[in-house]
Amino acid sequence: MFSLTQKIGFNAEKTACRYLQKQGLSFITKNFRYKQGEIDLIMSDQSILVFIEVRYRRFSDFIHPVATVTPLKQRRLIKTELHYLQKHRLLDKISCRFDIVGITADRQITWIKNAIEVEY
């Protein structure tokens, strides 16, 4: 049984995925986990592999969902990305980027491309 928070998260990820597909991205996988990290969506934008963090906030009066990706969360995402690339033997073979999709309770979507800088 899923908690209400998990259901809200799943719905936000589904909404983000549909939105990004309408923008031309292709779905690869979702909820890729490694140790303490998880990448919500992995998609492709032509020849670029896109790792996507989806953030939802019911109350966004004080802070936008996108602003909730902390430096610690960014480090975990990067470690998870590297594991994905190594596992699939893609390291140094494909261009990648990290995007963040923020969704508010009134379904406003903010998509930030290249939101997290990664240096290999």
Swiss-Prot record:
Q: Which residues form a coiled coil?
A: none
Query: InterPro entries annotated for this entry?
Result: Restrct_endonuc-II-like, tRNA_endonuc-like_dom_sf, UPF0102_YraN-like
**Which family does the record claim for this protein?**
Belongs to the UPF0102 family.
Gene3D superfamilies with a match to the protein in the record: 3.40.1350.10
Which molecular function GO terms apply here? nucleic acid binding
**UniProt-listed SUPFAM superfamilies:** Restriction endonuclease-like (SSF52980)
Q: Which Pfam families match?
A: UPF0102 (PF02021)
Q: What is this protein called?
A: UPF0102 protein CbuK_0265
User: Can you tell me where the transmembrane regions are?
Assistant: none
